[in-house]
Amino acid sequence: MEEFNTTVRISGFVLSSLMFHHLNSDADVEGLILGESVGEENCRITDSQIDHIQFEHTLNIQKHIPCHKLHSFYSNVGDVSEQKIRQILSDYKEENVIGWYRQRRNTRQQMTFMEQVIHRNMRKILSNQELVFMLLTPSQGTASGSTHRLEFSAFIWHSSQYINIPISVSNLGNLEQQDYWRVSSTCPSLGQSQAVNQHRAKFFCSGDDLREVRNVSDMNDALLAEMQKVCVEVEKSERTVEKLQEDIAQLKEAIGKQKTHPEEHETPISACPEEPKENTLLCSALRTLFPSVPSLRTQTLTVHGFPVLQLCCNTDHNIDISTKLPQILENQHSRRKVTAPRLRKKCLVASFPQRLKRKRKTREVSESASESGSDTEIEMNGQSGSNSPVF
């Protein structure tokens, strides 16, 4: 029984370089992939099967060469130019080309018809028939645009169709596979032991571990802890922003409904205005304090601002003002006592100038009388002097 498995292996450095180059460009990016193709054949013998052959085909991506623009090595109909590929490769050989890549924004992880035609024409020109097509599709992870997502996949031509093959990132796997970098070997040789003992103090700590590697590992753990804290904070802020955006969307939708259907949201205007509510306690208090003034118990005024006596309140509300508002009655009695002497003083003050006028008139009359009397006396004296004989 035979099995054929194909995988693509790429390092984190090359993948990050692809991402960096794509994010720094405003349009889609494409280019060539350089590397090597390795094939292995494993034969297993089990109780159920005498021979179990498994072919492992691994495509190791080592480098990528980006093109300056789209359609750099093919035409609008998908015809690939070998001369343009050599110009892009420059000092590299065609044997090192194991495929090409394309980066599209906000699209699906699926080959288009144009990409399938280009890939088929490249297989005809290049010597390596097992070409791989790598597709990278970045998109926004959240509505606010603070988190981005990058999906990548690889396709090869197999059995008259394009199939998706798995991609393995070498330094993003299980960290337990790299423990031998920090731990010394269990059975060292004699020469190795002598060399290590000679320089042990410089590179190794007391636990037979590499000092620099342990420090780097501790720093890595601290950075991971800080990154986890930042991730939690970013997640909380993202939830808050999403909630605010939902509220804003609901408000916009409500405003749009009000603009499109204003009749539904308008309050119906009644034909006749509501009658004002009567303050029965105030009406009873005014009736008690001013029983002879009915104009104070009306709520309707004329155009000129005069109360309408026909609409005054004449109903008895059966409210005892002496128990409800006892202070009003006390103030009323005290005012009556205080206002009586004030009226007398006012009358006295009002009659005082009349008396002064009368006194002034009598004085003027007496003065005029005295003046007239003195004049008559002088005249009489003059007459008596003139009639007397002169000797």
Curated annotation (Swiss-Prot):
The modification Phosphoserine is found at S388. GO terms for cellular component: BRCA1-A complex; nucleus. InterPro entries: BRISC_Abraxas1, FAM175, MPN. Keywords: Chromatin regulator, Coiled coil, DNA damage, DNA repair, Nucleus, Phosphoprotein. Residues 8-156 form the MPN domain. One of its GO terms (biological process) is mitotic G2 DNA damage checkpoint signaling. Phosphorylation of Ser-388 of the pSXXF motif by ATM or ATR constitutes a specific recognition motif for the BRCT domain of BRCA1. Residues 367-391 have a biased composition (Polar residues). Its main location: nucleus. It is found in: Nucleus. A motif (pSXXF motif) lies at residues 388-391. GO terms for molecular function: microtubule binding; polyubiquitin modification-dependent protein binding. Residues 354-391 are annotated as: Disordered. Residues 223-261 form a coiled coil. It holds the Pfam family MPN_2A_DUB_like. Belongs to the FAM175 family. Abraxas subfamily. PANTHER family: ABRAXAS FAMILY MEMBER, BRCA1-A COMPLEX SUBUNIT ABRAXAS 1. Involved in DNA damage response and double-strand break (DSB) repair. Component of the BRCA1-A complex, acting as a central scaffold protein that assembles the various components of the complex. The BRCA1-A complex specifically recognizes 'Lys-63'-linked ubiquitinated histones H2A and H2AX at DNA lesion sites. This complex also possesses deubiquitinase activity that specifically removes 'Lys-63'-linked ubiquitin on histones H2A and H2AX. Component of the ARISC complex. Component of the BRCA1-A complex. Homodimer. This is BRCA1-A complex subunit Abraxas 1. It comes from Danio rerio. The gene is abraxas1.
